[in-house]
């Protein structure tokens, strides 16, 4: 998508086996590109959330397996790499899906061919993610158009970040919004701040604004009030994992928005590629592993101070 009129991707690779990502922990205050040069770089990028979003995690992990094979293509090392990558963000099923497919791909391959086979898989997955998200956008555009009333502005609420920053390009939940904007539809987005990591405030509001899409940042608990007062026409969110029965596991807070939408008779949509569906699960409650992250993500808020420095500020009592 566009950053100040220039087309960008959240992850980019080239024929020289170079992989470049955006350090999303610095957004919206600093746009910094980082080159991933090793398996450990990829693990750190996922674990520390330089990259995030289920589809992007899957692509990044695939390149991580390439680096693992390049460094040591032995079966033992690659099995260890598989386990380490799975542990970085266990909720996102795209991660597991991509890695399991890589293991199957190289199972009987000659050792010296493994790195190139994995690189080819990763680069194709990168391109496939873009194609899938574009198609999600096309389908979602039809849904948006069906909810437009009397040529008025259509107000869409979204939670967390399921845009191009999460999916190489286009995004899932935001792809239909970008397609609508590009078509000239008067679309406005209510952006949940999405505590504790504030992906909505830091990422969704940033990428929508950079593309020119009208949006308003709201606190997480404002959605129900807006719905009660007729200011939300529809909701679109992404998914970290969806079961075969349709249970959706997404960023904390999504369930409450779904309940509010249901109570106010507002359409609620989830946008996702097939790789986000876990066909081995029929129920999401208590069956999907939910990662537990550091308490500092709640007690500290990251931002920019009056000196222009990015820093953390403590907002709670000492525990």
Spans of model-derived segments:
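Positively charged, low-complexity intrinsically disordered leader regions
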Residues: 1-40, 44
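Short beta-strand segments
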Residues: 22, 60, 157-161, 236-238, ...
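A short, flexible beta-alpha/helix-coil linker loop
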Residues: 27-28, 65, 162-163, 241-243
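Short, glycine-rich nucleotide/cofactor-binding loops
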Residues: 33-39, 161-167, 244-249
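Short, hydrophobic/aliphatic alpha-helical segments
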Residues: 34-50, 154-156, 304-319
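N-terminal active-site beta-alpha-beta segment that forms phosphate/nucleotide-binding
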Residues: 48-218
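Conserved phosphate- and dinucleotide-binding cores of soluble alpha/beta proteins
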Residues: 186, 194-319
């Amino acid at each position: 998508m566009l950053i100040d009129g220039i087309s960008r991707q959240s992850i980019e690779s080239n024929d020289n086996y170079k992989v470049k990502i955006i350090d999303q922990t610095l957004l919206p205050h600093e746009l910094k590109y980082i080159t991933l040069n090793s398996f450990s770089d990829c693990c750190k990028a996922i674990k520390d959330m330089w990259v995030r979003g289920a589809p992007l995690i899957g692509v990044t992990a695939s390149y991580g397996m390439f680096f693992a094979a390049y460094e040591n293509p032995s079966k033992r090392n690659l099995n260890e790499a598989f386990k380490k990558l799975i542990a970085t963000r266990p909720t996102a099923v795209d991660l597991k899906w991509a890695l399991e497919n890589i293991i199957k791909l190289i199972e009987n391959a000659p050792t010296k061919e493994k790195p190139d086979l994995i690189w080819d898989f990763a680069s194709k997955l990168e391109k496939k993610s873009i194609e899938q998200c574009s198609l999600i956008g096309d389908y979602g555009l039809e849904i948006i158009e069906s909810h437009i009333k009397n040529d008025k502005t259509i107000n869409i609420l979204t939670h967390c970040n399921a845009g191009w920053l999460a999916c190489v390009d286009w995004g899932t939940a935001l792809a239909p919004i970008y397609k609508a904007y590009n078509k000239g539809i008067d679309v406005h987005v209510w952006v949940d701040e999405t505590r504790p990591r504030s992906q909505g405030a830091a990422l969704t509001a940033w990428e929508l604004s950079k593309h020119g899409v009208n949006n308003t940042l709201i606190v997480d608990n404002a959605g129900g009030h807006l719905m009660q007062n007729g200011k939300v026409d529809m909701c679109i969110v992404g998914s970290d994992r969806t079961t075969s029965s349709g249970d959706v596991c997404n960023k904390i807070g999504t369930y409450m928005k779904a309940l509010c939408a249901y109570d106010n008779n507002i359409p609620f949509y989830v946008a996702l590629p097939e790789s986000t569906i876990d066909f081995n699960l029929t129920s999401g409650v208590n069956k999907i592993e939910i990662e537990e992250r550091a308490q500092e993500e709640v007690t500290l808020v990251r931002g920019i101070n009056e000196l222009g420095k990015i820093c953390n500020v403590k907002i709670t009592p000492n525990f």
